[in-house]
Structure formats: structure tokens, C-alpha cells
Swiss-Prot record:
Glycans are attached at N32, N55, N85, N150, N218. PANTHER family: CYTOKINE RECEPTOR, CYTOKINE RECEPTOR COMMON SUBUNIT BETA. The gene is Il6r. Part of the receptor for interleukin 6. Binds to IL6 with low affinity, but does not transduce a signal. Signal activation necessitate an association with IL6ST. Activation leads to the regulation of the immune response, acute-phase reactions and hematopoiesis. The interaction with membrane-bound IL6R and IL6ST stimulates 'classic signaling', the restricted expression of the IL6R limits classic IL6 signaling to only a few tissues such as the liver and some cells of the immune system. Whereas the binding of IL6 and soluble IL6R to IL6ST stimulates 'trans-signaling'. One of its GO terms (biological process) is ciliary neurotrophic factor-mediated signaling pathway. Classic and trans-signaling are both inhibited by tocilizumab, a humanized monoclonal antibody that blocks interleukin IL6R signaling. It comes from Rattus norvegicus. A short soluble form is also released from the membrane by proteolysis. The sIL6R is formed by limited proteolysis of membrane-bound receptors, a process referred to as ectodomain shedding. mIL6R is cleaved by the proteases ADAM10 and ADAM17. Glycosylated. Glycosylation is dispensable for transport, signaling, and cell-surface turnover. Glycosylation at Asn-55 is a protease-regulatory exosite. Glycosylation is required for ADAM17-mediated proteolysis. The keyword Cell membrane applies. This is Interleukin-6 receptor subunit alpha.
Length: 462
């Protein structure tokens, strides 16, 4: 079915120009006897009465806003370089007797209309309008010819009357469209008056794809106290949009006043406020918002009018000498504390990451800084490992020099002692009866005991 509709639309657009003429656009008819003319032309008026023929003296009177009179010989009155304000009725008299009336209509032919169609809500009808560059004459009329392309019922032709609004300075026409209707329309605007007519180019639109909301309303940009780089932005749905059945998604864009490049954020559906976190300190910013149907039906609205705002500035601090301090200087701790305080924002004020790069640091600078930091960290780790290894080897060397060796450094040499096997005479008796009070010679290495009698039982068995 869709292929049939597309084929039909292509066939209509590819047809010759004659086949695309939706209706006959002709100049408006005027009453019998009315003389029409363009501005700047020369007009000849003829008194209609028979008695005015010949060389009779005819008195002419203009019945317009300004009273004017002429006297001519004969029944003709010649007006040179007529203007629009010469439009009116011209009365001709013969001997103070009214002979006849000649209507004159001076008009400007209409300019070629440029038709544009839109639909501000999926629940409303479509509107087509044209804004002429100059105010049209009171006799100018407009009508729109339309063809409705229906894949099931063929095509239907109809006309829509258009009204001129003095307040909006435009012609507008309303095309009835049912909710959910996806048919195609081909429309053309015909503008005509008594001296000419012009027709616009054909406009083709699809009922759903042409939906375009009005720009968001009541955009407000304000500073957040204590946040030198934050801006709070809030807005509302346009009055022409009914949020009962269809919601809007939004996009926000902002820039410093001296910049031409915008940073664009996509926002959540039905979100009507957000916080900009990367505004420049003390710099005025331009902010705009636009909207579109939540399921991408139709087109984006136009951007809202520009609204400016400046982030919060710290109050000047007075030094002891009475000189005010820098108002834009804020401590890092205060800024971090404020970020912690506002970091967990509500759903309505949650901020998404910007689509375009919003960091004021250029990419080459960021790469150089990151590479320098990584090189410094690697150098520190290398130095620490070298020092640790050096300290470990030095500690092991000191522990070897201070502690005694666990084993002898060389082979042990036996110690030879000359011990007599026999005790000299008299030695045994001279020891006395009390051995406890005398010196006991039981050790073989004692110099006072040259003889050792501990093994005498070996030599003298009992």
C-alpha cells in the first residue's frame, strides 16, 4: 500500500506543469462600466449620458475622500499618472444636472505568493500561510486549491478560502486533517484582484511528517549561588502544544557571547530544566532551546529567542588596605563542596553529557599533559625500585659483618698436653687430711696441677 502511494506521488510530481495546475487562477471580475487601471497610467473617462455628446461643457466632480472638480469641453475627462487614491466615482454634470457616473479602480497586481504549510500539534488541522511584502489592496482575495491523495479512494479536489489578518499581515488557510491521518496533500495558493492574479508553486506535505511545534516559551537563564561555572536553565511548552497526549523532547544549545560555535545537549523527554556545568567564569552566555514530538514525529521546532545569562560571581573581598579583591576568584574547596551539594540533582535537573566537546582544554594540550604525567609516574616507580634494591643489599652486607659465623672458618687443630702418668712421691701425702680446704686439681689444664691421678686405677688395679 505504501509503495502504491509513493508511486502515485512520484507520478504526480513528474507530470507536466499543466497536469499540476490545481485550479484556474484568474483576475476578479468588476462591475459593468468600471474602468480599471494600473498606478502611473493615463486614464480617459467618458460621461455616459447622450446629452453630454458633442462640445457641451461638462462639469466633473470626484466623490472620493477629497473633493475635486474639473470642467471639460466634451464628454471626456483625461487623468494622468493616476494612483491608488484616485479610485472612486466620478460624476459628470451638464447645466447642474447629473448626467452619469464613471467608477474608476486603480489597483496594484498581486505579487507571487510563497506558500508555507505547518501543523503545530498532531491533534490540530494543518495551516498554510503567506506573508506578502506589502499590504495588499482591499479588493485582493486569496483561495487555496488542494488535492488530497488517498491510496484507497483515489484523489479528491477541493478549495479552501483564505483570510487576511491585519494584525499578522498574512493570508492563512486551514486544511482539515484527522488525527493519525497519513495521506499526502498538494496545495497551491491563488491571489487575485481586479487588475491581475498570481499563483504560488505547489506544496506537497504528509499529514504526520509536517508536524512542527512552536519554539519553547518562557526561557529563563539564571546563576546558581556558589557555583562560578554553573547556569540554571528552565522553559515551558509552547501554548499551541497539548501535553495531555503527546510530550516533547528538547535540545539545548549555548555559547559565550563572543563565540559563534554552539554546544548542543540532547535532553530527556518532558524535561523542562537543566544545569550547565561548564560555563566560563564571569562570561555572559547565549542559551536557546527547541522541541520535537517525543517519538520523532514531524520536525524540530525553530530555536527559541536568545536569552543571556552570566554565572555567579563571588562578592568582592575587601583587603586591610581597602582594596577590593578579585570577584571571580573562588577557592577550589568551595567549588568542590558545592558540586557535592548539587551533584545529586533531581530528575528534572539531571544534566546529560554534552554532544559536542565542551572542555575548554585543547586536545593537544591534554595529550601532552597526560603523557608528561605518565612519564613522571614511571620515573618515580623506577627510582623507588632502584633505591629499594640498594637498601636491601646494604642491609644484607651489614648483617653478615656483625653476626658470628655459624661454623668455624678453618680446620680445627688438636691441642697436645704432656701429662705424667705417675704422681711424684710426697705429693699424695702432702695434700693433708682436709681436701675441702686445699686446692682441688681435677682439671688437666690447671697449671698448678702438673700430675693427674684420676686414672691411677688403670695402672694399679686393686
Amino acid at each position: 500500500m505504501l509503495a502504491v502511494g509513493c508511486t502515485l506521488l512520484v507520478a504526480l510530481l513528474a507530470a507536466p506543469a499543466v497536469a499540476l495546475v490545481l485550479g484556474s487562477c484568474r483576475a476578479l471580475e468588476v462591475a459593468n462600466g468600471t474602468v480599471t487601471s494600473l498606478p502611473g497610467a493615463t486614464v480617459t473617462l467618458i460621461c455616459p449620458g447622450k446629452e453630454a455628446a458633442g462640445n457641451a461643457t461638462i462639469h466633473w466632480v470626484y466623490s472620493g475622500s477629497q473633493s475635486r472638480e474639473w470642467t471639460t469641453t466634451g464628454n471626456t475627462l483625461v487623468l494622468r499618472a493616476v494612483q491608488v487614491n484616485d479610485t472612486g466615482h466620478y460624476l459628470c454634470f451638464l447645466d447642474d444636472h447629473l448626467v452619469g457616473t464613471v467608477p474608476l479602480l486603480v489597483d496594484v497586481p498581486p505579487e507571487e505568493p510563497k506558500l508555507s504549510c505547518f501543523r503545530k500539534n498532531p491533534l490540530v488541522n494543518a495551516f498554510c500561510e503567506w506573508h506578502p511584502s506589502s499590504t495588499p489592496s482591499p479588493t485582493t482575495k486569496a483561495v487555496m486549491f488542494a488535492k488530497k491523495i488517498n491510496t484507497t479512494n483515489g484523489k479528491s479536489d477541493f478549495q479552501v478560502p483564505c483570510q487576511y489578518s491585519q494584525q499578522l499581515k498574512s493570508f492563512s488557510c486551514e486544511v482539515e486533517i484527522l488525527e493519525g491521518d497519513k495521506v499526502y496533500h498538494i496545495v497551491s495558493l491563488c491571489v487575485a484582484n481586479s487588475v491581475g492574479s498570481r499563483s504560488s508553486h505547489n506544496v506537497v506535505f504528509q499529514s504526520l511528517k509536517m508536524v512542527q511545534p512552536d519554539p519553547p516559551a518562557n526561557l529563563v537563564v539564571s546563576a546558581i549561588p556558589g557555583x562560578p561555572r554553573w547556569l540554571k536553565v528552565s522553559w515551558q511548552d509552547p501554548e499551541s502544544w497539548d501535553p495531555s497526549y503527546y510530550l516533547l523532547q528538547f535540545e539545548l544549545r549555548y555559547r559565550p557571547v563572543w563565540s559563534k560555535x554552539f554546544t548542543v545537549w540532547p535532553l530527556q523527554v518532558a524535561q523542562h530544566q537543566c544545569v550547565i556545568h561548564d560555563a566560563l567564569r564571569g562570561v555572559k552566555h547565549v542559551v536557546q532551546v527547541r522541541g520535537k514530538e517525543e517519538f520523532d514525529i514531524g520536525q524540530w521546532s525553530k530555536w527559541s529567542p536568545e536569552v543571556t545569562g552570566t554565572p555567579w560571581l563571588a562578592e568582592p573581598r575587601t583587603t586591610p588596605a581597602g582594596i577590593p579583591g578579585n570577584p571571580t576568584q573562588v577557592s577550589v574547596e568551595d567549588y568542590d563542596n558545592h558540586e557535592d551539594q548539587y551533584g545529586s540533582s533531581t530528575e528534572a535537573t539531571s544534566v546529560l553529557a554534552p554532544v559536542q566537546g565542551s572542555s575548554p582544554i585543547p586536545l593537544p594540550t591534554f595529550l601532552v599533559a597526560g603523557g608528561s604525567l605518565a612519564f613522571g609516574l614511571l620515573l618515580c616507580v623506577f627510582i623507588i625500585l632502584r633505591l629499594k634494591k640498594k637498601w636491601k643489599s646494604q642491609a644484607e652486607k651489614e648483617s653478615k659483618t656483625t653476626s658470628p659465623p655459624p661454623y668455624p672458618l678453618g680446620p680445627l687443630k688438636p691441642t697436645f698436653l704432656l701429662v705424667p702418668l705417675l704422681t711424684p712421691s710426697g705429693s699424695h701425702n702432702s695434700s693433708g687430711t682436709d681436701n675441702t680446704g686445699s686446692h682441688s686439681c681435677l682439671g688437666v689444664r690447671d697449671p698448678q696441677c702438673p700430675n693427674d691421678n684420676s686414672n691411677r686405677d688403670y695402672l694399679f688395679p686393686r
